[in-house]
Amino acid sequence: MKRTVSIVGAGRVGRTLGRRLHDLGWRILAVVTRSSAKSREAVRVIGAGTPMRLGRSAGLHFRERKTGSMRALALNLDKVFAAEVIFFTTADDVLPSLAGAFARLAGDRSRGRIVLHTSATLDRVALAPFARYGAAVGSMHPMQAFGGSVMPNLKNVIFAVEGDPRAVRMAESIAKSLGGIPVPIATRDKTLYHAAAVMAAGSLYATIEAGLQLLERAGFTRRRAGQTLFPLVRQIFDNIERIGPRAAWTGPLSRGDYEILARHARALRTGVPEIRKAYAALAMLAASLVSANPHEVKKRTAQALDV
């Protein structure tokens, strides 16, 4: 018998999970989004499911934390909760309020179900209203970038899982079936886990953009700037993965060439001030975390950069 799943909030993460599960033979029952057009598009991408939208309802609403606006809930809850597993893949700002509204409306239809969300920062508490009606709740977050138009492969991706025992077992099973690697995480550590991802990967968007802009100031076209930096960045990632950050560390600071740092600082005095500040902050961070002699390297780096 095929396993069944409903998906609430079919953005990039929801569509990816839905498509991958559909490919594995899961029955996709309901796909719920803010609008009919978005839900139909999500069903088209996933390849299965009944499109549903959040609409007007008699007295049941949830509040979006980011905007403070109220939205109404009206849909076929029998269809949604006919599934064994219900995924909430919505944005963090709306998840607790939306889950509460769903749980109140679904009532005992939640009993025996497994309700999971994919937030990197929120934990099972966001789904606590379902637990009060007898559902097992938890979270499973894939450490993967979902930007762009290409649906990411989840093979070998780490899934951080936490929650009630039955929810964790299901999350681990789903992660493994997707080719991923489930890793248990303590509820209290989820925010730190997400901060690690943003520090290691999310900040790259800004640092690489800064590098591209500096090359444009040096006379490169945008295309040529990308051709110059991207192979370098890819090679650095390969080296870090292979031998670790400390062994892979390269550049003037790793060689103790403080005169080069001083020249960089002078060159960066014109242009975007935030780039110079970021350069100095990242150099000091490298001196603290990667160098073999942090105290001395930090001191000389600060002198070279005049910070």
Language-model segments: residues:
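Short, well-ordered alpha-helices that flank and scaffold nucleotide-derived cofactor binding pockets
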Residues: R15, R19, D23, R44, ...
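Short, hydrophobic beta-strand segments that form beta-sheet elements in well-ordered domains
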Residues: L29-T33, V115-T118, F159-E162
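NAD(P)+-binding Rossmann beta1-loop-alpha1 motif at the extreme N-terminus of oxidoreductases
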Residues: M1-L77, F81
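Internal alpha-helical scaffold of NAD(P)-dependent oxidoreductase catalytic cores
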Residues: R40-V45, G49, F130, G134-A135, ...
